[in-house]
Curated annotation (Swiss-Prot):
Localisation per UniProt entry: Cytoplasm
Gene Ontology terms, MF aspect: GTP binding; GTPase activity; guanosine tetraphosphate binding; translation elongation factor activity
Principal location: cytoplasm
Residue intervals of the tr-type G domain: 8-290
Function: Catalyzes the GTP-dependent ribosomal translocation step during translation elongation. During this step, the ribosome changes from the pre-translocational (PRE) to the post-translocational (POST) state as the newly formed A-site-bound peptidyl-tRNA and P-site-bound deacylated tRNA move to the P and E sites, respectively. Catalyzes the coordinated movement of the two tRNA molecules, the mRNA and conformational changes in the ribosome.
Pfam families listed in its UniProt record: EFG_C, EFG_III, EFG_IV, GTP_EFTU, GTP_EFTU_D2
Alphabetized UniProt keyword annotations: Cytoplasm, Elongation factor, GTP-binding, Nucleotide-binding, Protein biosynthesis
The organism of origin for this protein: Acinetobacter baumannii (strain ATCC 17978 / DSM 105126 / CIP 53.77 / LMG 1025 / NCDC KC755 / 5377)
InterPro entries, sorted: EFG_II, EFG_III, EFG_III/V, EFG_IV, EFG_V, EFG_V-like, EFTu-like_2, G_TR_CS
Protein name: Elongation factor G
Length: 712
């Protein structure tokens, strides 16, 4: 089957935003105007097509990025048909991993901002992730019909808060309840959408007299931005004082693709205005798969040679599994982004990360949670495969004869954990299966069994994250679970260098055990080193044979899993084996492993050991009246206020760093202090030393035989 849409007419885009900026409604409108969805789904009544998980409909927030394919030929059918793959990403901080995951496979993004709330904390997080993956983007200021809407204020905030370079290509006609349409600065005409057809039809009109000067000023700004794309355009502009429509689009496109500028539009998705022009901008300014840098990977050879795969059907097949979901009808759905080559139903693919070959059952194109079977996928496509058993998020799938491992995704370590147990013994096995599947879908969610207590521990990125996991166990797998109190993932480390002997000697009849080492423990700067532990050796003259170095390292690492101070994992240590002795007969791997473990245990306690706790970046938005109470409460929680911003409508944004241990139950407390009017967001910032008085309580509990983590 030949390719139906040329790859140059593909756009793989993400729609990304802060909670309540109206992102899901915007996506809904895209599906409506591109003809996929007949009745517009509103989040207000819990019926949006993209928010397909039940919890999302209840909570009104988007949790998983559903991928949808649609087609667009322009508001006035001015383009040949383009294929747009839309990935809807969540806007809640606990789900930042989902955003990160979708950024990896996108070619361009559309950032949605609220015309009233503007650039909010989560917007900054998403912006940083888009910078990290160098994703070209445009911005859409939504909710122009709301009281307090101000397009130009959001333009300013993008500059000051995000360090962005926004270039509006439309300006609004009116605002709040007088918002009627936009002035298109490229055409220099007013666009008015037809209410009766829910915005499917529109007409160009004259620019309202009171807007002519504003429009002219912003048009000049836009034309200058386009002219800076090349010397040729700049010369033309300086000679003629203006640029043609084609030149403006070419200049803005070149600079958007280079991430130098962000084209800005506005509208009201809810009122069916503006999304149509934004779709045109996606085609005009965002890249096709052939216009972004070719994906890089590592070949399957001794030297791990770097290689890239061009976005072409002729290149060997390569794809990235960026999301795994469990579907009650077909089982595992693996969402893949195809970077090169063609994959047909029934083909075998190779997974170099797991060194396994698997066969593809069906290939389905998703529209939110409805699916359509297709025969093949080609470079640039995003689709879901059925029947892959051993694939995890972030794995590469490729052609067996041309093996390549694409860059893996990095997932943050969880910061919060809690114990779960099934309400009935009968549910034990069901719970294990459920947790296993959920962990496969979501790499930022981890499950392990506590060795001391035998309890099942689940860990994630925040309270909401774990709430939703427990909720999904109940809904999708029918497992009722009791959950324990949340526990903080503390860490242990050292502050000074020490040298320590470690000796393991056992003498019984016959062959004994003998391992003897001297190890130097040094503090390691985790951030600078890019790792949490390092092992080195400086053994001279073979006093410890080479074959036992690995055993010493292993002994130390095993001891680090459950630290010496309070049983928490140890980080930030460099261990150097520099001396020791051995016995020809009695020395073996186990002896040196034990010697290494003892040296670490004893040395650690002399190296000025400390407990580290996760510190969260917290941002609270509150009406000014409650600011004093909120600040006082953050201080009581050992918070350090970093700064404050004034937001529109007399609201203040308070930025602080607060230990996670002090943040449990914060949402309830904050709501009661502000009569439900304050909101907050929280994300992991760093690990920092726990104050002595707090650490002493945790250590004392551990030494008295209490379990780690049951600190209040």
């Amino acid at each position: 089957m030949a390719r139906q849409t040329p790859i140059t007419r593909y756009r793989n885009i993400g729609i990304s935003a802060h909670i309540d900026a109206g992102k899901t409604t915007t996506t809904e409108r895209i599906l409506f105007y591109t003809g996929v969805s007949h009745k517009i789904g509103e989040v207000h009544d819990g019926a949006a097509t993209m928010d397909w998980m039940e919890q999302e409909q209840e909570r009104g927030i988007t949790i998983t990025s559903a991928a949808t394919t649609c087609f667009w030929s322009g508001m006035g059918n001015q383009f040949p048909q383009h294929r747009i793959n839309v990935i809807d990403t969540p806007g809640h901080v606990d789900f930042t991993i989902e955003v990160e995951r979708s950024m990896r496979v996108l070619d361009g993004a559309c950032m949605v901002y609220c015309a009233v709330g503007g650039v909010q904390p989560q917007s900054e997080t998403v912006w940083r992730q888009a910078n990290k993956y160098k994703v070209p983007r445009l911005a859409f200021v939504n909710k122009m019909d709301r009281t307090g809407a101000n397009f130009f204020r959001v333009v300013e905030q993008m500059k000051t808060r995000l360090g962005a370079n926004p270039v509006p290509i439309v300006v609004p006609i009116g605002a709040e309840d007088t918002f009627t349409g936009v002035v298109d600065l490229i055409e220099m005409k007013a666009i008015i959408w037809d209410e009766a057809s829910q915005g499917m039809k529109f007409e160009y009109g004259e620019i309202p007299a009171d807007l002519v000067d504003t429009a002219q000023e912003w048009r000049t700004n836009m034309v200058e931005a386009a002219a800076e794309a090349s010397e040729e355009l700049m010369d033309k502009y300086l000679e003629e004082g203006d640029l043609s429509k084609e030149d403006i689009i070419a200049g803005l496109r070149a600079r958007t693709l280079a991430s130098e500028i962000q084209v800005m539009l506005c509208g009201s998705a809810f009122k069916n205005k503006g999304v149509q022009r934004m779709l045109d901008a996606v085609i005009e300014f965002l890249p096709s798969p052939t216009e972004v840098k070719a994906i890089e990977g590592i070949l399957d050879d001794k030297d791990e040679t770097k290689a890239s795969r061009e976005a072409s059907d002729e290149a060997p097949f390569s794809a990235l599994a960026f999301k795994i979901m469990n579907d009650k009808f077909v089982g595992n759905l693996t969402f893949v982004r195809v970077y090169s080559g063609v994959l047909k139903q029934g083909d075998a693919v190779y997974n170099p990360v797991k060194s396994k070959r698997e066969r593809i059952g069906r290939i389905v194109q998703m529209h939110a949670n409805e699916r359509q079977d297709i025969d093949e996928i080609r470079a640039g496509d995003i689709a879901a495969c059925v029947g892959l058993k051993d694939v995890t998020t972030g794995d590469t799938l490729c052609d067996e004869k041309n093996i390549i491992t694409l860059e893996r995704m990095e997932f943050p370590d969880p910061v919060i954990q809690l114990a779960v147990e099934p309400k009935t013994k009968a549910d034990q096995e069901k719970m294990s299966i459920a947790l296993g599947r959920l962990a496969k879908e979501d790499p930022s969610f981890r499950v392990h069994t506590d060795e001391e207590s035998g309890q099942t521990i689940i860990a994630g990125m925040g309270e909401l994250h774990l709430d939703i996991i427990v909720d999904r166990m109940k809904r999708e797998f029918g497992v009722e679970a009791n959950i324990g109190k949340p526990m903080v993932a503390y860490r242990e480390t050292i502050k000074k260098t020490v040298e320590q002997e470690g000796k393991f000697v056992r003498q019984t009849g016959g062959k004994g055990k003998f391992g003897h080492v001297y190890v130097r423990l040094e503090p390691l700067d985790v951030e600078a080193a890019g790792k949490e532990y390092e092992f080195a050796e400086e053994v001279v003259g073979g006093v410890v044979p080479k074959e036992f170095f690995g055993a010493v390292d292993k002994g130390i690492q095993e001891r680090m899993k459950n630290g010496v101070l309070a049983g928490y994992p140890v980080v930030g240590v460099k261990a150097v084996l520099f001396d020791g002795s051995y016995h020809d007969v009695d020395s073996d791997e186990l002896s040196f492993k034990m010697a290494g473990s003892y040296a670490f245990r004893d040395g650690f306690m002399k190296a000025d050991p400390v407990l580290l706790e996760p510190i969260m970046k917290v941002e609270v938005e509150t009406p000014e009246d409650y600011m004093g109470d909120i600040m006082g409460d953050l201080n009581r929680r050992r918070g350090m206020v970093q700064g404050m911003d004034d937001l529109p409508g007399g609201t203040k944004a308070i930025k602080a760093e607060v230990p996670l241990a002090e943040m449990f139950g914060y949402a309830t407390q904050m709501r009661s202090m502000s009569q439900g009017r304050a909101t907050y967001s929280m994300e992991f910032a760093k690990y920092a030393e726990t104050p002595r008085n707090v650490a002493e309580g945790i250590i004392a509990k551990f030494q008295a035989g209490g379990k780690k983590g049951d600190d209040e």
